[in-house]
């Protein structure tokens, strides 16, 4: 895992990444801890610029609280069991540094997308978690089957899955 402390806000972030053993899902678990003596209102932004090569166009959209990025025969789904606070497809590089992205429908090819989650207000010494899933999938299934798979992934016991992966690699 990786630990980062924002010294200005005194916010500690612990990131743990692992891949599920049974399918192509990258699990990114974040733990936020307020080391400050004041409450902190925390939002978490994810920026994705999917690019396989310069001649391979990518398109993005948001459906069912999932960022979907298409790239010819493959699709990447970015989601959590928590709802989005906001999202933006296209030109997110211009806004993301402000910490605010705007819900904006965009029709066209764009590899540049962002989503944000409301972690909420953290009291001093309080911890909260967010798990983000990245699911890489060959685009050969119906939407119904895919929605069922995404629902099952959201229901996973992340701690149990992490222990299973650790045990496998030891």
Label each region the model flagged.
Residues 40, 120-140:
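Short Pro-Gly-centered flexible turn/kink motifs
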Residues 141-145:
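Short conserved micro-motifs at the rims of enzyme active sites and ligand-binding pockets
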Residues 133, 169-170:
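Short amphipathic alpha-helical segments enriched in leucine
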Residues 3-5, 9-106, 113-116, 124, ...:
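Polysaccharide-binding surfaces and accessory modules of carbohydrate-active proteins
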